[in-house]
């Protein structure tokens, strides 16, 4: 994982202000100031952009400390980076950066372990999503219908998965998407959640079952919740005829609430019984 990432998601090693400082390229610094002026709607002079990397302990630019609206917005909300804000994908303040720096959102929202990378979904993932999601044994176990086409999978990526709390599960060794995990909007259903308590959901393609991937991904998600949010608890559940999913939750600290429910909003038989579990700090 990259370690020198600006508050807005820019990789500092690719930032023109940083490159101009490292190389002494005044023409590049001037051009960057002109571009950033247009993006921000305020005058940014070249001398404001003598940058040593805005996430290091070294000298920060005048632009970063006194002018950057993105940095001020994040700091005002108590965030180290925009990646801690659930509104990042729809935020008008950071939108110019995300538009001109396609990898910024991945830099902000990706995390993982030695084996797994959890990153935002890309539209280019549509074919691999369809490959897994057309399987009639995958979606129905998690309460969603098998996909009927690549176009449907693309639509799901753009309209269901396109948020700051839903991730593709990627095997680092092969750089291959193998499943999904998230909490909040993409997972909401009819579980008996507390106020402001997100619902967690996850799945992996059938060929990756029984390899500990969901357990590892869920543990990573919980670690992110603990370290980067104020969320106090999470709720989830599994169909009683899919106990393996419940074991994943229990391994990660979820405890059965003693409640069972049904969820008419999920795919399939609305009378299927769901066992409810909860994780708490």
Question: Where in this protein do the model-derived segments appear?
Answer:
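Cysteine-centered metal-binding/redox modules
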Residues: 1-112
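An alpha-helix initiation/capping motif
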Residues: 6, 147-154, 243-246
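Short, charge-rich binding segments
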Residues: 74-76, 159, 174
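Acyl-donor (CoA/ACP) binding surface of acyl/acetyltransferases
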Residues: 109-139, 166, 170-281
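Conserved GNAT-fold acetyl-CoA-binding loop/helix
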Residues: 137-158
